[in-house]
């Protein structure tokens, strides 16, 4: 096998989020900067917004005079 082919692996790579959260993981980069992490992502924080598309369907039905059966 060729020597020096693979990049150096860092077992204690630091991940820094835009929200200020930091944690360590393994990576070929010594430091990673991310925009979203599990501490600030809406899915994990419970601040997820649910979009209601029912109003759009009703508007379409009314516009084209379609009756639901």
From Swiss-Prot:
Molecular function in Gene Ontology: metal ion binding; rRNA binding; structural constituent of ribosome
Binding-site positions, Zn(2+): 17, 19, 37, 40
Pfam annotation, one family: Ribosomal_L31
The keyword Metal-binding belongs to this UniProt entry's keyword annotation: yes
Highest taxon listed in the record's lineage: Bacteria
Cofactor note: Binds 1 zinc ion per subunit.
GO BP annotations, alphabetical order: translation
GO cellular component: ribonucleoprotein complex; ribosome
InterPro entries associated with the record: Ribosomal_bL28/bL31-like_sf, Ribosomal_bL31, Ribosomal_bL31_A, Ribosomal_bL31_sf
Keyword annotations: Metal-binding, Ribonucleoprotein, Ribosomal protein, RNA-binding, rRNA-binding, Zinc
Cofactor(s) of this protein: Zn(2+)
NCBIfam families (alphabetical): L31, PRK00019.1, PRK00528.1
Subunit-structure text: Part of the 50S ribosomal subunit.
Family: Belongs to the bacterial ribosomal protein bL31 family. Type A subfamily.
PANTHER family cross-referenced by the UniProt entry: 50S RIBOSOMAL PROTEIN L31, CHLOROPLASTIC (PTHR33280), LARGE RIBOSOMAL SUBUNIT PROTEIN BL31C (PTHR33280:SF1)
Job description of the protein: Binds the 23S rRNA.
Name of the featured protein: Large ribosomal subunit protein bL31
Source species: Clostridium novyi (strain NT)
Gene: rpmE
């Amino acid at each position: 096998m060729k020597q020096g082919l693979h990049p150096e692996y860092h077992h204690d790579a630091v991940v820094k989020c835009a929200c200020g959260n930091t944690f360590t993981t393994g990576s070929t980069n010594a430091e990673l900067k991310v925009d979203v992490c599990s501490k600030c992502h809406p899915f994990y924080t419970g601040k997820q917004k649910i979009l209601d598309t029912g109003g759009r369907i009703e508007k379409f039905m009314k516009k084209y005079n379609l009756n639901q059966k």
